[in-house]
Amino acid sequence: YLVVDLGEEVSAIKFRSTNTNRANDSSWKTINLYTSDSYNPAEWFDGVEKIDGNTVYISQAGTQKETTLTGLPNGVSEVYNSEIIPLSKPSRYLWFEVTETTKGTPYFALGELEIYQCSMVVLE
């Protein structure tokens, strides 16, 4: 997982990720995005247990699941631009849980990650 402190609460985000320029690297393919008001890894990992040897269940307590993104690009230096993601409530911390990588490895590599605060305008 990857945790980002935005420094202040935001109501909507979008992000841009760039894969590394190395062909053998494993990028994120499927991720769950969670948000929280505070950074508390002990709460996040509350209830960790081994299942089937290597698989780990994580409770994600204290966070709110916002979305699941699938089919992220797997090419060398390939760029992904997310849509605007409205958050369920203003939040300061983003938790990117990588559930699948492009090469099926238990680790991932990113070249760059940019996160943008967005404003939502409702037209009447």
Give a label for each model feature.
Residues 46-86:
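Extracellular carbohydrate recognition and processing domains
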Residues 1-47, 79-123:
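Aromatic, loop-rich ligand-recognition surfaces of beta-strand-rich domains
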